[in-house]
Amino acid sequence: MFQLLRCVPRVLGTAVAGLRAAAPSLPRLQPASRPCARPFGLLSVRARSVQLPGLLKPRGPCACGCGCSGLHTEGDKAFVDFLSDEIKEEKKIQKYKSLPKMSGGWELEVNGTEAKLVRKVAGEKITVTFNINNSIPPAFGGEEEEPSQGQKAEEQEPELTSTPNFVVEVTKDGSSKALVLDCHYPEDEIGQEDDQSDIFSIKEVSFQATGESDWKDTNYTLNTDSLDWGLYDHLMDFLADRGVDNTFADELVELSTALEHQEYISFLEDLKGFVKSK
């Protein structure tokens, strides 16, 4: 019985092999041909034979004829010429070739557009910090005066004056707190000096931890808009006793104006070099 079962697979295998040999071979299915939607010539772009649009266009010599391969237009050349003339004119009217010194024994430290004045007296350190950015007040609108006879129009232009906000920080030896007074030049007081009036005012007063560059908003800040005038006068006298008075404020305007003009000329020179660079 077992011998008959073993013979069955062999017999079936022989029969299937015979049927395969007798049946005709069918052709294999081939995929239908489809025309290419994009010509192969466009797949490989040649810079010499095909004109590339926009940013793909090969970079050639600049339009002004200097021979450089960078973006350099006739407008850039005119811009550089204008900046050259502007720098010459600004240097002609530059009042201070070097920064003026402050009276009263103040030591000056300059870091870019930020300046710091430091003074030590009787166990106290007074630090005044200001920044010249956005320190020139805008010109007030109004009817322009016509130049008088024999006077050129450019002579009528007002002199630009830098009146920055400044912060006075007073620290005492051995104290962990600093008294900070935020001061500014009121616009209506600029150019209207009086022997009895202050040319600067205190906006805010607060205590801050010494040695910290970032002051905390969680510390109480006193706004002087609603301050008792008696307390305000004592604060102004407190500053005057430490050398921050009208004379100091006048000299600070001179220093800030000189620094602002110096940085403006440096900016024009950097701008000229940037536009001119290849």
From Swiss-Prot:
Transit peptide location: 1-70
Segments of this protein annotated with the region C1q binding: 73-90
GO-annotated cellular components: cell surface; cytoplasm; cytosol; extracellular region; mitochondrial matrix; nucleolus; nucleus; plasma membrane
Region described as Interaction with MAVS: 166-209
Membrane topology value: Peripheral membrane protein
Highest taxon, organism lineage: Eukaryota
List of residues that carry Phosphotyrosine: 185
Residues recorded as bearing Phosphothreonine in the entry: 210
Primary subcellular site in the record, as a coarse category: mitochondrion
This protein's record includes keyword Protein transport: no
Name of the featured protein: Complement component 1 Q subcomponent-binding protein, mitochondrial
Gene source species: Bos taurus
